[in-house]
Amino acid sequence: MITFENIQQLEKYTLMTMHGLFNQLKLGIISIDNAEHLLFTPYMMETLSSLGVKPDIIDLIHKRTELEDFAAFNLSIDDTVTVCLQRSEELLKQYKSVEFNDKILINWRVIQK
């Protein structure tokens, strides 16, 4: 479970996670499907929106859905990923003062198949 003290921490964490995923996509380390399983789903968009996460962040998650369209037509995703990386960096700069003062990741659980 991940616990946040306020919405700003959640927004910063989401942006940091997105930035990392976009960077890994750009480097070819993970697949589009893998990134989707981690964060980029309609469920995550709805959940984050219901918690009051800023629309700019929700829009960036939605933008990732375009990558599937590119992949379906065997087109390069590099330009879109670069734009998403830049946008996530711009948004992250707004959260410089947001700190994580306590451990946020607690109650680890691994489910083995």
Q: What do the predicted segments below correspond to?
A:
Residues M1-K113:
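Acidic, Ser/Pro/Thr-rich low-complexity regulatory regions
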